[in-house]
C-alpha cells in the first residue's frame, strides 16, 4: 500500500472522528447559547458546567431501541440516515482546513483531496444529501414524515439552485473552482477578502446555506409545532443520531467554506496565524447560526418560496450580470 493511500486513510479517520466529536459538542454549545438568550441555565447537572451532558446524550442514543415502523420500507428506511452521513463527510474532502505544515520532516496537506473543482464537488456531494430526508419521509409510512419529505423536496432543491447561482459571481472574480486557489487569491491581506468585492453574494449564500442546512428560521422539514419531527418522526436511537450528526457536520463544513471563500480562509490575519484565524472565522459562523436560531421566528412555506424565487434568485442573477460587466470593463 502506497504512502499516499495510507496518508489519505489516516486523514479520513481523523476528519470523521474530529467532526463527529465536534457535532456532539456543538449540541452542548447550542443549548448553552439558547439558554443564555432565554435567560436560562442550560445543561448544568451532568459534570462540571454540564460538560458531560454530551456523553450522557450519546449513551442514551446508543442504548435506545432501534424501531422500524410497521409497513415501512426497511431497506430505504435504513439507507436514508447512511446517505445523510456519507454526503456530509464526503463533501468535506476538498476543503483545506489549515495551511500546510511539516510533521517529522514530511509535508502534510490538511485536506483529503486537492481537486481543481473542489467547490463544485462540495456543492454536488452536499446536494446528494437531499435524498436522505426525501427517502426517510417516503419510507416511514407516516403522514408527518411524508409532509416533511415533500417540504424537503421543495425547499432543498429550490435553495440549491440559488446557492449555486449565487456563488458563480465570486468564482468569476477568482477564475477557479479550487478552494485552495480561492484561498490563495485572498492572501494579499484583509482588503482582498471576497466579502468586500461580493457582499451581495455573501449575504445570499449565507441565507441559502441556512435553508439547505435546515436551520431556523428555515427548519420547515421538521417543524415541531406543525409536523412533529418531520421526516425524522419515526426514527430513534442510532439512526436518528446519524441524521442529527450529519446536520451538524454539514454546518461545520459550510462554516469553513464560507470562511475560505469570503473571509480569507487560513491566510494569516494580522498577528493571528492562519490556522487559528480560520478556526475563529468558522467558529463565528457556527455561533451565528445558533444566534439566528435564538432570534428569528419560523417562516411559512409560502413565504420561504416567495423569498427564494422572487427575491434571492433575481438578485443572484443580477449579481452575475453586474460582475461580468465589471470584469469586462
Curated annotation (Swiss-Prot):
PROSITE patterns: COMPLEX1_ND1_1
Subcellular location: Cell inner membrane
Keywords from the named record: Cell inner membrane, Cell membrane, Membrane, NAD, Quinone, Translocase, Transmembrane, Transmembrane helix, Ubiquinone
Membrane topology reported for the UniProt record: Multi-pass membrane protein
EC numbers: 7.1.1.-
Signal peptide residue numbers: none
Function: NDH-1 shuttles electrons from NADH, via FMN and iron-sulfur (Fe-S) centers, to quinones in the respiratory chain. The immediate electron acceptor for the enzyme in this species is believed to be ubiquinone. Couples the redox reaction to proton translocation (for every two electrons transferred, four hydrogen ions are translocated across the cytoplasmic membrane), and thus conserves the redox energy in a proton gradient. This subunit may bind ubiquinone.
Assembly notes: NDH-1 is composed of 14 different subunits. Subunits NuoA, H, J, K, L, M, N constitute the membrane sector of the complex.
Protein name per UniProt: NADH-quinone oxidoreductase subunit H
Amino acid at each position: 500500500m502506497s504512502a499516499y493511500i495510507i496518508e489519505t486513510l489516516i486523514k479520513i479517520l481523523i476528519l470523521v472522528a474530529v467532526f463527529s466529536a465536534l457535532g456532539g459538542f456543538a449540541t452542548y454549545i447550542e443549548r448553552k447559547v439558547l439558554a443564555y438568550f432565554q435567560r436560562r441555565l442550560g445543561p448544568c447537572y451532568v459534570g462540571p458546567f454540564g460538560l458531560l451532558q454530551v456523553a450522557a446524550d450519546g449513551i442514551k442514543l446508543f442504548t435506545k431501541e432501534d424501531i422500524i415502523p410497521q409497513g415501512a420500507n426497511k431497506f430505504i428506511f435504513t439507507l436514508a440516515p447512511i446517505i445523510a452521513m456519507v454526503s456530509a463527510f464526503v463533501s468535506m474532502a476538498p476543503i483545506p482546513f489549515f495551511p500546510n505544515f511539516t510533521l517529522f520532516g514530511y509535508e502534510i496537506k490538511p485536506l483529503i483531496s486537492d481537486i481543481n473543482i473542489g467547490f463544485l464537488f462540495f456543492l454536488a456531494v452536499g446536494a446528494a444529501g437531499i435524498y436522505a430526508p426525501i427517502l426517510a419521509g417516503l419510507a416511514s409510512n407516516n403522514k408527518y414524515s411524508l409532509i416533511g419529505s415533500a417540504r424537503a423536496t421543495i425547499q432543498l432543491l429550490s435553495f440549491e439552485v440559488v446557492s449555486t447561482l449565487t456563488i458563480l459571481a465570486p468564482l468569476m472574480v477568482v477564475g477557479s473552482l479550487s478552494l485552495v486557489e480561492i484561498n490563495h487569491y485572498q492572501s494579499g491581506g484583509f482588503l482582498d477578502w471576497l466579502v468586500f468585492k461580493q457582499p451581495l453574494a455573501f449575504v445570499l449564500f449565507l441565507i441559502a446555506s441556512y435553508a439547505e442546512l435546515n436551520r431556523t428560521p428555515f427548519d420547515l422539514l421538521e417543524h415541531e409545532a406543525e409536523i412533529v419531527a418531520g421526516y425524522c418522526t419515526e426514527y430513534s436511537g442510532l439512526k436518528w443520531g446519524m441524521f442529527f450528526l450529519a446536520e451538524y457536520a454539514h454546518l461545520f463544513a459550510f462554516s469553513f467554506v464560507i470562511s475560505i471563500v469570503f473571509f480569507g480562509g487560513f491566510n494569516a490575519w494580522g498577528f493571528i496565524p492562519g490556522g487559528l484565524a480560520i478556526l475563529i472565522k468558522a467558529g463565528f459562523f457556527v455561533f451565528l447560526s445558533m444566534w439566528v436560531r435564538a432570534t428569528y421566528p419560523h417562516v411559512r412555506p409560502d413565504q420561504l418560496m416567495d423569498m427564494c424565487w422572487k427575491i434571492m434568485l433575481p438578485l443572484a442573477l443580477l449579481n452575475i450580470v453586474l460582475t461580468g460587466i465589471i470584469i469586462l470593463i
